[in-house]
């Protein structure tokens, strides 16, 4: 199974400067956990201490926004994820 997670430049220092990391998993959450297993330094950049997605992390699965309560959504071979931080200000 090949699922790709696209890593933004500001998180690449935590993935050994990899822009794309291939992961395995049957759900979005499992794929994110596999990312953390391969790149442990990114863990606290996307999850809080309870293992919940940080509220400023945004995930897109094949171009579709995934809400924090949809992490159990199925993932399949060929999927591509994009991670982003949501920035605010005024």
Please name every model-derived segment.
Residues 1-89:
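Ubiquitin-like/PB1-type beta-grasp interaction modules and other compact soluble beta-rich domains
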């Amino acid at each position: 199974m090949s699922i790709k997670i696209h890593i933004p430049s500001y998180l690449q220092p935590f993935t050994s400067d990899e822009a794309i990391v291939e992961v395995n998993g049957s759900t979005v959450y499992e794929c994110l956990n596999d990312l953390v297993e391969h790149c442990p330094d990114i863990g606290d950049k996307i999850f809080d201490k309870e293992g919940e997605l940080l509220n400023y992390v945004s995930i897109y699965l094949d171009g579709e926004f995934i809400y924090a309560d949809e992490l159990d959504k199925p993932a399949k071979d060929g999927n591509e994820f994009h991670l982003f931080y949501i920035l605010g200000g005024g």
